[in-house]
Amino acid sequence: MPRKGNTPKRDVLPDPLYNNKVVAKLINSIMLDGKKGVAQKICYDAFAIMGEKTGKEPLEVFEEAMNNVMPLLEVKARRIGGATYQVPIEVRADRRQTLGIRWIVDASRKRGEKYMRERLAGELLDAANNTGAAVKKREDTHKMAEANKAFAHYRY
């Protein structure tokens, strides 16, 4: 535990092309070894591919994908009397966004296409259509929470 209180959350600057903070967080999540320019190129190329394939505004498709991936509930391990229970809890708004982005990027990295821009575009399109690995991850998380609803009274 920190001795000097909590540090304030740092605000992310919006990305240069779409002027959107969530897109900036996606770029930061894609970034490896501090190579932000590469991450931006991947993200913007993926958005261009999405725009071509759907004919819709890429930002709309991205927001739809995010809404389909962000979890409402998750389970948290809580130890009570020597037993560990998986206690379902509601997910805070900022954590929902973080988990959604993380799951989309992780699912993209595991896809089979040759280039990351194609993998990311494919995963975002799948998520917008309520299919794909990121949406499956959300459904699994919700199933876990539903299965452990009996332990909800142990909430924090």
Curated annotation (Swiss-Prot):
This is Small ribosomal subunit protein uS7. It comes from Clostridium novyi (strain NT). Belongs to the universal ribosomal protein uS7 family. One of its GO terms (cellular component) is small ribosomal subunit. One of its GO terms (biological process) is translation. Pfam families: Ribosomal_S7. Keywords: Ribonucleoprotein, Ribosomal protein, RNA-binding, rRNA-binding, tRNA-binding. Part of the 30S ribosomal subunit. Contacts proteins S9 and S11. GO terms for molecular function: rRNA binding; structural constituent of ribosome; tRNA binding. One of the primary rRNA binding proteins, it binds directly to 16S rRNA where it nucleates assembly of the head domain of the 30S subunit. Is located at the subunit interface close to the decoding center, probably blocks exit of the E-site tRNA. InterPro entries: Ribosomal_uS7, Ribosomal_uS7_bac/org-type, Ribosomal_uS7_CS, Ribosomal_uS7_dom, Ribosomal_uS7_dom_sf. It comes from the Bacteria.
